[in-house]
Regions:
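Conserved DEDDh/DEDDy metal-dependent 3′-5′ exonuclease domain
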Residues: 17-19
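Fe(II)/2-oxoglutarate
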Residues: 3-5, 175, 180-190, 206-383
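Active-site region of the double-stranded beta-helix
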Residues: 3, 21, 28-193, 208-247
Length: 383
């Protein structure tokens, strides 16, 4: 396996690692659920030289049979020849893609590095643009990419110390396809369809797509991150239920950190340290990027006002003293028990779908309308 303790700190490109056509087929199969992906708010669109503009995305029923169809469709929808589309949480839409990463990467990662992983967060970038709208940047976690093609892309990478000595620690300005990459001079790596790329955390990088192409990505989630996420979500959901606490405002990250650190009845005092504050910061920006940013797509509101779980999944419930443990989509929530909370999850298990109106009606048996609406918003962001 190409990942081991000796080379974990280095950029790795393994040529022709995978048969890209097989994953490309899985990707197009996933895109048959394009409407569902849009409704889930797990899609971001960048055009007009890299500015985010989800208003461009319309809900047209379309079958994507090949690359040309998809590129033609998106160019027409966005009214732009250069654009970037980012899709998050692909593991919810394609079992084949998810199984590929589990079989080929997760087990090998744990075996070679001795690091237990909860799993991977899967995503995709596709489009045609000069430099990625995120500019030259470093990531908080290791990044794994599999390039599907059909055309090559170009990857620019800088060791952190070298880049920061030239440009400082700040990433380049976001929302711009024209990031100047000439100052920290480096030759691009040509990445062909089927190539596997490993970018260690902290390594600055940028991607160029002069021709249309699709890339799948995975962010490893260490088991420790799972424990942090559980506490984070438990605290927020419990606060919403008991105090009508509203997390879904655009608040400065320092204010969010301060508020979370004050929730001592859920999060242990021992976690109040620099590492924990860094984790809060990372989680905040992850949520802001992929979860709670308002998606401005013009969609049917009735479709947004419902929660769905896959037909083959069940929400597991377990009572523990005054709490209800809820295992949903890989996240364990510890919620203060109430009959209405238990009723709504049992309803969702039976019907696989619950509308906002039905859920509010159930929750309002024991809480205010304001609190019930916030519970709906939070639970929906994790389904």
């Amino acid at each position: 396996m190409f990942l081991n303790k000796e080379n974990i700190s280095k950029l790795i490109i393994s040529n022709k690692f995978v048969k890209a056509k097989e994953l490309e087929y899985a990707f197009y199969t996933m895109l048959k659920q394009f409407d569902n992906i849009i409704h889930s708010k797990k899609i971001r669109v960048y055009k007009d030289n890299g500015v985010r503009d989800d208003l461009s995305l319309q809900l047209n029923k379309t079958s994507f049979l090949n690359v040309e169809d998809l590129h033609k469709f998106l160019s027409k929808e966005f009214k732009a020849t250069d654009y970037c589309v980012a899709i998050s949480e692909i593991e919810k839409y394609s079992h084949k893609i998810s199984d590929f990463f589990i079989s080929n990467i997760i087990h090998e990662w744990s075996k070679n590095l001795g690091e237990q992983l909860l799993g991977f967060e899967l995503y995709s970038f596709l489009g045609k643009y000069k430099i990625t709208p995120f500019g030259i940047h470093d990531d908080k976690e290791h990044t794994i990419l599999v390039h599907l093609g059909p055309n090559p892309m170009y990857l620019y990478c800088w060791e952190s110390e070298f880049y920061e000595s030239i440009a400082g620690k700040e990433s380049t300005v976001l929302g711009n396809f024209n990031t100047d990459i000439s100052k920290p001079g480096v030759s691009p790596h040509k990445v062909e369809p089927g190539d596997f790329i490993f970018i260690p955390k902290g390594m600055y990088h940028a991607i160029e797509r002069s021709e249309f192409s699709i890339t799948l990505g995975a962010i490893p989630i260490p088991l420790t991150a799972r424990k942090f996420s559980e506490r984070f979500i438990q605290a927020k959901l419990s606060e919403i239920i008991t105090n009508s606490y509203n997390f879904f405002n655009y608040k400065p990250v320092d204010q969010i950190k301060s508020e979370i650190l004050n929730i001592t009845h859920i999060i242990e005092d021992g976690l109040k340290n620099i590492d924990f504050e860094n984790e809060i910061t990372n989680e905040y920006f992850r949520l802001k990027s992929n979860g709670f940013l308002v998606n401005r797509c013009l969609v049917n509101q009735s479709v947004l006002d419902e929660i769905k779980i896959s037909d083959y999944k069940n929400i597991q419930l377990k009572k523990e003293l005054a709490y209800l443990l809820v295992f949903i989509n890989g996240i364990e929530l510890k919620i203060r028990h109430s009959n209405s909370i238990e009723e709504l999850f049992n309803y969702l298990n039976s019907n696989k779908t619950i509308t906002k109106d039905i859920m509010i009606k159930i929750l309002c048996k024991e809480m205010s309308l304001e609190a019930a609406e916030k519970v709906f918003t939070l639970i929906k962001s994790y389904t």
